[in-house]
Each structure stands twice: as C-alpha cells, then as structure tokens.
C-alpha cells in the first residue's frame, strides 16, 4: 500500500488529501534565488570535497588506521549524506523554478534525514567512549577498542537510528493533510509538517519528545560522563605536552558535540511556537550545510596527523611509515 493511502481523509468528509507539498525555500524573491543557488552549490562542493578528503586520508594513511579515525571516517560519510539528502534537491528546484515535492518524496527525505542525524548522535557517543578508553585506560585500549568492537558500535548506531527514523516516518504517515500544503522550510521535517496536519498531532509530538530524550538525552549524558572522567585523567598528567596533546584530541570532538546537540535541542524541543518556522530555516541551514562543512575543518585544524595525511593526498604522495 502506498504511504499516501495512509493519509487519505476519512470517508464522509469533503476534504481532499494533499498529494504534494510546496517548499517555500530560504528566500521567496526571484532576485535572490540565483545568489542562494551559487552559495548552496559552493557549500555543497566544499562539504563533499572536504569530507571525502578526510575519508580518503583515513583509508590510505597508515598513521590514521586507529579507532578514533575510523569513527571520523564514518562521520564524514554521514556529513556527505546529510547535505546530499537536502541540498541537491533544493538546487534542482531553484533551477527548475518548481517548488513542489510529492508526499512520498517528502516522507523519504524525512526518513533519511533522521536516519543520518540519529547515527550522528550515537557515533559521537562512540567517539567519546573511544577517548575515554584511550586516555583513562591506555593499557587495555587496543583490546577493548578492537576492530570488532568498532564495527559493532557503528552497526548499533545504524540500528538505533534506523528504528528512530522509521518510527517517526510511520507516525507521520498516519496524519491527515487536507491543506494548506505550503511548508515554510527548504526540506521536509517534523515540526513544519505538524503545523500543516488537519488531524491532531499530540501523539506525534509526545513521541518526538520521548524518542528525542532517548536519541539525544541518553547519548548526551554518556558523553558528559565520559568527558568528566577524561578531564579528571588529563588533569593528573604531569607533562604539559601530554596535557596539551590529550586536550587537542578531545577539543575537536567536544566542539562538534556542542554544535550538534545544541542545534538539535533548539530545533525539536520547542514545538508549538508560532514563530518557529523562520528560525527553523536558520537552524536547518546550520544542520544540513554549515555543520557538515565545518566538521572537516574542526577535526583537521588542530590535528597534525590529519593535516599531514591530507597534504600527502593532495600532493599525490603516501606515507612510508
């Protein structure tokens, strides 16, 4: 059965089910659309290029064949996926001057966006666990963070994220949309679609809060707990150089964690706000464009190993070690 069938209005009503949505986009003036197109295209090329460069460095550079960089490579794949789910479709709409998206395509975009964002939550938690073992239990680090454990953590992240995305998508498909169909955003997401539903969204919003607490709250608590132990261990290091190295490996990850969870809480924990849509556009740009574009810079800026590997890739040389 088509997902669209699930949202048809009840028999006996004169309302017509919405077959497509109109995404209003970032700007509605035609004069600004070419500017937005150029900026988004530039951001997409920079983001995909930067993250794929990080992935290539992790794959080909022996110095980066470590658990921390294994997770970083997976994070780069997620960043490419996140921006690819939203930006190319928007670029296509800007070129064709067609702002509509079918109902099924909207739900598909919703599913894949939450799949990738959910994986981010748990992958960042796995990276915090990796730093905890590396700094607090260095003698048993190699056995506790074996390749099998690494793959299991990534697989568990995927399974949890898939369950979360499927839950929200199925719950959304049970809502009725009878018009209006204008989404004040540039991609399909839960808060904006809730505003358009002609049936009650109380259960959906309750589900979003409950699952959001599990998907974001639990990883955030685990990350804070891990880094409290890491901070205590680092402060016990007598060598200034040792402290500096430990903080540098954790600083990049903490920056990404703050950016990721901060915008997630702002976006999904304030449903019901009448002025939410315009603010959500800015948050959406940060989620799908700026954050994935910044991550390669954040992780390579203070990491000489990553910088060296990137230079070797760009210059066409391989490390001999």
Curated annotation (Swiss-Prot):
Q: What SUPFAM superfamilies does its record include? A: Family A G protein-coupled receptor-like
**Top-level taxon in the UniProt lineage:** Eukaryota
In the record, what terms sit under GO molecular function?
A: G protein-coupled receptor activity; olfactory receptor activity; signaling receptor activity
Its membrane topology is listed as: Multi-pass membrane protein
UniProt key word Disulfide bond: yes
* Annotated Gene3D superfamilies: Rhodopsin 7-helix transmembrane proteins
Q: Which residues are glycosylated?
A: 14
Disulphide connectivity of cysteines: 106-198
Biological process (GO) annotations held by this record are:
sensory perception of chemical stimulus; signal transduction
- Location, primary (coarse class): membrane
Residues on the Cytoplasmic side?
59-66, 130-149, 230-246, 302-321
Q: What residues form the membrane-spanning segments?
A: 36-58, 67-88, 110-129, 150-167, 206-229, 247-270, 282-301
* Keyword annotations: Cell membrane, Disulfide bond, G-protein coupled receptor, Glycoprotein, Membrane, Olfaction, Receptor, Sensory transduction, Transducer, Transmembrane, Transmembrane helix
Task: Give the protein name, as stated in the record.
Answer: Olfactory receptor 3A2
Source organism of the structure: Homo sapiens (Human)
């Amino acid at each position: 059965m088509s997902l669209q069938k699930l949202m048809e209005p009840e028999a006996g009503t004169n309302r017509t089910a919405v077959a497509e949505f109109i995404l209003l986009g970032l700007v509605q003036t035609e004069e600004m659309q070419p500017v937005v197109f150029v900026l988004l295209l530039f951001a997409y090329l920079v983001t995909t290029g930067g993250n794929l460069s990080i992935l290539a460095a992790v794959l080909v550079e022996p110095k980066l064949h470590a658990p921390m960089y294994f997770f970083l490579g997976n994070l780069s794949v997620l960043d490419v996926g996140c921006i690819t789910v939203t930006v190319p479709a928007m670029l296509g709409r800007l070129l064709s001057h067609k702002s509509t998206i079918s109902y099924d395509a909207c739900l598909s975009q919703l599913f894949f966006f939450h799949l990738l964002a959910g994986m981010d939550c748990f992958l960042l938690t796995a990276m915090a666990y990796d730093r905890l073992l590396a700094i607090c239990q260095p003698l048993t680090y190699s056995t506790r963070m074996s390749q099998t454990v690494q793959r299991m953590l990534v697989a568990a992240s995927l399974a949890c994220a898939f369950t979360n995305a499927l839950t929200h998508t199925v719950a959304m498909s049970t809502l009725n949309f009878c018009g209006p169909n204008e989404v004040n955003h540039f991609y399909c997401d839960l808060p904006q679609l809730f505003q358009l539903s002609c049936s009650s969204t109380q259960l959906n919003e309750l589900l979003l809060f409950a699952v959001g607490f599990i998907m974001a709250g639990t990883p955030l608590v685990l990350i804070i707990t891990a880094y409290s132990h890491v901070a205590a261990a680092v402060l016990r290091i007598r060598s200034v150089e040792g402290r500096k190295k430990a903080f540098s490996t954790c600083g990049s990850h903490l920056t990404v964690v703050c950016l990721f969870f901060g915008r997630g809480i702002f976006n999904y924990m304030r449903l019901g706000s009448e002025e939410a849509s315009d603010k959500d556009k800015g948050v959406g740009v940060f989620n799908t464009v700026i954050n994935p574009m910044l991550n390669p810079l954040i992780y390579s800026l203070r990491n000489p190993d990553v910088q060296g590997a990137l230079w070797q890739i760009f210059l066409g040389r391989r490390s001999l070690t």
